[in-house]
Amino acid sequence: MFNGFSHTVIGASHITSGTVCQDSSVFRVYENYSIAIVADGHGSKKHFRSDKGSEMAVKAALDTVEEFYRNPDAFEECFLSDPDGIIKKMEKNIISRWNRLVIHHYTRNPYTDKEKEKFTEKEFRRIKVESVYGTTLVVAVMGRKFTFGTQIGDGSLVLICEDAAAEMPIGYEENAPANITASMCNSQAINYFHSFYAVDEKPIAVFVSTDGLYTSFRSDEDFLDYHSILANQLANINAFSPSIRKNLSKRAKSGTQDDTSLACVFDCEVLAEKIEDLKEQVEVNKIHASMRKAEHKARMEKQKFKNALNNAQYEYEDD
């Protein structure tokens, strides 16, 4: 009933600097549900084990969903009676599991002299253990009776709806608040999760990705169109998956040159029913993309003319 894929590629900037990949991703498909997860370790100076942190976030989320779904019928009944409450419980469970994994790793792997050498003694004392492993997390679950997702920090979740339209039920800006570290390592992490659920429709697919993918596009429209193109190829996912990875690698070499992860799960039956709608949506998107390109070109030409006019005016005044 369900299928999916996941890919993680290292960014060019990390290859150049000799930094390990900070991203992690996974997908799982079961009889009654499927899961797609990505995480992006922060990678900055004080988050020097965030590559491990992202791996732990993926594991914590996967284990949480599997535990809640241990009795699928009972879980579905509970979820439908209180979606917000169940998602909040799952978020708390993920945080708790992640913190336990962090402490477990830390106690068995004390900080090395090499890890400490970048800090003064005073600076190092101020760093909390959880912060060392800081990471974002995006989780999507597609089941028999509903689809839901939750995330903390930047990254994106794209839903391919029943009508073949692509949308982001959780806005990108919502998960990247200014001046706030929306992270698994935040002491108030539970307050920075954002979620969505859909119980009245049967989505075709759901994608989750780290911010390396989103920032490689010029606009939200282009970003969503990309997912429509991918959705249109999901029926041949085994053959198409290598091309997806190749494209992600190409994107990770340009733009922000960041690590990039993309994971997806989809309903095979709904996909088969809606494949013609997806093809039509891709063609409509192409028309809109051409219009956007023409409008962008016109704006650039207008700005170019305006700049030339201003320069001519300055030269005249100087004379």
Label the model's feature ranges.
Residues 1-22, 100-128, 170, 278, ...:
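Short glycine- and acidic-rich boundary segments immediately preceding or forming the N-terminal edge
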Residues 36-40, 150-152, 207-209:
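Short hydrophobic beta-strand that contains or immediately precedes a catalytic carboxylate
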Residues 1-67, 155, 186-190, 196, ...:
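N-terminal entry segment of metal-dependent catalytic domains or homologous docking segments
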Residues 19-29, 125-144, 148, 172-218:
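Acidic loop->beta-strand submotif enriched in PP2C/PPM serine/threonine phosphatases
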Residues 75-158, 192-203:
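Catalytic core of PPM/PP2C metal-dependent serine/threonine phosphatase domains
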Residues 179-319:
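C-terminal catalytic subdomain
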Residues 29-32, 142-145, 153, 160-164, ...:
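Short acidic-glycine loop/turn motifs at beta-strand connectors
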Residues 59-101, 227-249:
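Helix-loop-helix
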